[in-house]
Amino acid sequence: MYNRPRMWDGQRILTSSKKPSITKKSYTLFLKPDKKVSPAKVGQVLSSHFTGTKYSSYGKWKGGYRPINVPTDVESHILHVPKEYAAIQWLTMASPANSVYLPFYTNIIDTSSQYKVDGDYQDPTNTKSAYWTYKTTAMVIEAYKHKKFIDSSTGKKTDLIYKDVNPTKKAVTKQLKANLAQSDKVAKTLSGDKLTAYLTEQNQKNADYAQKKWQTMNNSLIVHSNKLAPVTKSKLTFNK
């Protein structure tokens, strides 16, 4: 039962017209998706924890099935090879459900600084590290994913995902797609060393932009999580 429910979840997202059952003992190996698959759709599959179903590990987790996305994920990536050129690696660090897929051109001369792993970047207190920026989000969400608090701006109950993560993820993804479309246009006018230098520069700009937004969001997460932390009441006793 380790992998079958995860196969069901992937097929549920890509071929919902088939209406598969999570309790099936076998699944068709090859299926044609209902619609053309985009990097975003693949990301939806890789980020899924039975999202939007009664089996969600962020809900009642009926059945206790292991999801595709788990809190201990280290990274997730999608290799995208457009017809016009190759290639783009969509990379997210830590748990993809609470992170964002960044488009990285592969025809480059250097790796974005926050993704270089050496001694300093293995330190969880290092704010320059992309991994620890996104891992911080995953750790806070995992601790409080089942708890709600009153949103002071609306007076309604909400949780950390809907209040902080989802809006940030949506805004950052939209901006990254716009950045990619613009840099694609410029890249078509370049070649050789100028092209690779430009693509390397764009990767760094996107990495810096997304990480800054995520660090700002993490600050908000920590503030809001304080509202969810349990308060322990103790009774004091005194010797007479």
Task: Give the residues covered by each predicted segment.
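C-terminus-biased signal that marks the final domain/tail of proteins
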Residues: 1-240
